[in-house]
Amino acid sequence: MNYAYPDEKGHYGIYGGRYVPETLMQSVLELEEAYKEAMQDEAFQKELNHYLQTYVGRETPLYFAENMTKYCGGAKIYLKREDLNHTGAHKINNTIGQALLAVRMGKKKVVAETGAGQHGVATATVCALFGLECVIFMGEEDVRRQKLNVFRMELLGAKVESVAAGSGTLKDAVNEALRYWVSHVHDTHYIMGSVLGPHPFPQIVRDFQSVIGKETKKQYEALEGKLPEAVVACIGGGSNAMGMFYPFVHDEEVALYGVEAAGKGVHTEKHAATLTKGSVGVLHGSMMYLLQNEEGQIQEAHSISAGLDYPGVGPEHSLLKDIGRVSYHSITDEEALEAFQLLTKKEGIIPALESSHAVAYALKLAPQMKKDEGLVICLSGRGDKDVESIKRYMEEV
């Protein structure tokens, strides 16, 4: 399969690009230049690998979920344990790389957006490590849902700005973070948390997250002597999925499944299933599939999981959907909760609500596969942050 994206202008087919005001164009170009240089620089790669190993705790295990496998009665189920990274999710793979870039570019300050708070915590963590000033924008609804992560960020020395505009969720936090970056561009680096935003952000985040798929490939081959037949990951903006899928894109014998949040159901207004129900538009500097109405107004996204309720999806996922290399599905709040409880009870692993969407889809897929086939789930994060809201949810039900 001939797959080489993005092109030199940052496009993935028709998607991606750089839809930014003049005031940001210079910074985006400066970042692209610095990133290209860093990728060619052996010392940078060495330093990045050093921190990934000794600070983040990579490589993460590929765990054979024997009890889940028996329960499903089909394919062998493996979990890529991104929940075991420092800070409890895949997010730090990207923030550590981008913080090293910021230092390399001589920036003193970092700004970021966060939904569930995981990216905020991972950003505040690396800022503490490298002595960078840190400002995090978070929607006020998410601040309410994720009080613990807000406190964590403040403990780490970050300033958390609550955003009341719009729906008070991730989209609004991104708006404010971009605004802040425009006015502080000389000394500030924006650490985008997903494969979103203007080029080169989707590429940078994908490349830093690709460590997930590279390790998985190597580990699975060592265990089974072949590649897995299927790989499943959840999708909000899409960074854990892109990191898992990208190293497998050319291996056409490996089926790739992306799982979005169907919320209360894709037939309702309360979902975040952008690739299932969305249409093409531009948001936050990039062309991609979006949840929007006929006038092009962005619609609210809903999910029980704070990390999946973004009304867009990365440009590369948009392309992978169109060319049919990845098949995208959606899982409801209810199904994700059931999967959350099942994995916890069967394996003693409490997954993040985001990752539970991938687990839920894998539970449907595994029984349709043969016993000698393998299915890998990207367990993108741990569920400690969700236990309180799940307790509330179960009490209400």
Swiss-Prot record:
Name of this chain's protein: Tryptophan synthase beta chain
Superkingdom: Bacteria
PROSITE patterns the record matches: TRP_SYNTHASE_BETA (PS00168)
Pathway: Amino-acid biosynthesis; L-tryptophan biosynthesis; L-tryptophan from chorismate: step 5/5
Gene designation per UniProt: trpB
Lineage summary: Bacteria, Bacillati, Bacillota, Bacilli, Bacillales
CDD domains tied to this protein: Trp-synth_B (cd06446)
Listed SUPFAM superfamilies: Tryptophan synthase beta subunit-like PLP-dependent enzymes (SSF53686)
Family matches, as InterPro entries: Trp_synth_b_CS, Trp_synth_beta, Trp_synth_beta/beta-like, TrpB-like_PALP, TrpB-like_PALP_sf
Organism in which the protein naturally occurs: Bacillus mycoides (strain KBAB4) (Bacillus weihenstephanensis)
Pfam families in UniProt: PALP
